[in-house]
Each structure stands twice: as structure tokens, then as C-alpha cells.
């Protein structure tokens, strides 16, 4: 019994270490780092494109996500961040050259350019003035 308990505890500890050591997928956007997870939010609202959630950002702050668009807190490293979703294809037509009348606009009242640079432009506008 003691041996089984010891092996069980050892296995749980090893599983915990592996889980914590798992690297988050990071990508650069302008001057900021992000972690991404695939997330399909309201799939049929605009198109069947892949929606993305930014849940880890160095400069993250609550004003970037409206109250009703916050889904949950997600852990990234030792900190927790809001998860918010958007799509690269910012008008839902599948070509990534949208005019911004999309989920980005509904979230932030702004205009995206279809290739993800919306984030950099929006952040630059907030932080560089």
C-alpha cells in the first residue's frame, strides 16, 4: 500500500511538472508578445474562419475588452489575463482584406486591415500619444 501510494504521488508530481513546463505558443505583433490558442467564437456569426484569442500580452489591460466580451481569465506564466477574441479576416469574406465591419469593430469600434495589424495600430494609438 505504501509503495503504491508513493508511486502515485511521484506520478502526480511528474505530471504537474510536465504541465507547468509546457511552453506557450508565442508570436510577435509589433512590439508586443502574445500567446495564442485556437478558439471558435460564434462560428456562424461572420464566416467559418478561425477566430483567435489573445490571452497573454505584456501590455494587457481591461479597457481592451468590453465587459460582455470577457470570457474567462487564462494563465500565462505566473500571471492571469483576460481572453478576448477576434479574427484576422476582418470582414468575414475569407480573403483577409476586409473593411473592418466585423468582430473587431464590434469589440473595439475600430477598423482592422485584415492581416492582424489592427492590434499594433490600436495599441500604438493608445500608448504612443
UniProtKB/Swiss-Prot annotation:
GO terms for cellular component: extracellular region. Component of conchiolin, the organic matrix of nacre. Specifically expressed in mantle epithelium. Residues 91-100 are annotated as: 5 X 2 AA tandem repeats of N-G. Residues 1-23 form the signal peptide. Keywords: Disulfide bond, Extracellular matrix, Repeat, Secreted, Signal. Sequence repeats lie at residues 91-92, 93-94, 95-96, 97-98, 99-100. It comes from the Eukaryota. Its main location: secreted. It is found in: Secreted, Extracellular space, Extracellular matrix. May be specifically involved in the formation of the nacreous layer. Belongs to the N16 matrix protein family. Heterooligomer; disulfide-linked. Pif97, Pif80, N16 and other proteins form a complex. This is N16.5 matrix protein. It comes from Pinctada fucata.
